[in-house]
Amino acid sequence: MGWAVWNMLGAMASESVAAVDLFCGAGGLSCGLQQAGIKVVAGVDVDPSCRWPFERNIEARFVHESVREVTGSDLDGLWGNGDSHRLLAGCAPCQPFSSQRRGADSKSHEAWDLLLEFGRLVAESRPDFVTMENVVPLKSAPVFGQFLGGLAHLGYFIDFKAVRGVDHGLPQTRRRLVLTASLKGFVPIPDRTVPEGQVSTVRDAIAGLPPLAAGQTDPDDPLHCARALTPINLRRRVASRPGGTWRDWPEELRAACHRRATGSSFQSFYGVMEWDAPSPTITTQYHNYGSGRFGHPEQMRTITPREAALLQGFPPDYQFLPPGVPVRFTTLGKMIGNAVPPAFGALVGRAILDAVACPTH
């Protein structure tokens, strides 16, 4: 379904809940909330490059500001004086707790306190509903306990759990921590929203795109562009099989890190996706062949930004760059890899609308 159609459906849907999206990025969470029928009135993010995709696709106000500088009265102004229930949504940057940062000390990073800034804004604005999405390891961090304590003190009914993307139609193995909090009653997070055994795959998501060689671009879609590979990485890709590892290669193709005793820790590096399975978690480095299992299942290249966006669950015509702006893989990597998959926003949005229709206490 085209994104223009989703926007039309959103305009026809119930506007009983109005959302402000903190740390909105390019709009993944907002996209899912809109798909569920929630009206998104604004997004806030410190990255100015996210303004165009957010405003273009979500058709809501983008506020270029650090969440640290935002106040509850600012949020009141964004929500306005309507009769809608207020939802404050967001995904604070997760780098301190990410499984990609092996051995990182969360106390050595400043980003962890953004969750407490989120909690401050909840206390200052007292929205009817709150939702947060983040990495699963955050669940055991002291800062998360502090955040929960603040919500409970304010009188919120709270639910949170680790959610698997494949249980909600995402063609990706991503697991995330999802939280709901409500002043209107308990909002349970569903375990799954697709039938048991129904799994979306890489083939389902990207098989219909035109084939490309490494370094080529689809003339009809600038985001369907494959990063060039070095000669040795092209040889490595040719020697790889879907679902395999670098152990399938001849010795001369193996990197120095693979020859060390610790090399067994990097089984998925230089890996190739399988057609009939979900993709691995899409990270900001999906365009780098050596950074994970990001090889295309049969074409001798890494996945493109468009393919990464589809594996994240974005609509096929979601736009990330203004017309004529050159593709920068690092910028798009952050936009797409850091995005909340819309499927997670949609499952929370539907749960909140169900709670509005049938409140429980």
Language-model segment annotations:
Residues 3-129, 136-149:
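Core alpha/beta nucleotide-donor-binding catalytic domains of modification enzymes
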Residues 22, 136-140, 168, 172, ...:
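Aromatic-acidic/polar surface patches that form glycan- and anion
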Residues 52, 145, 149, 204, ...:
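A broad, structural surface signal
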Residues 73-84, 95-269:
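Class I S-adenosyl-L-methionine
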Residues 90, 178-181, 280-284:
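Short hydrophobic-aromatic micro-motifs
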Residues 92-93, 127, 171, 315, ...:
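Proline-centered helix-kink/hinge sites
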Residues 224-361:
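C-terminal target-recognition/interaction regions appended to catalytic cores
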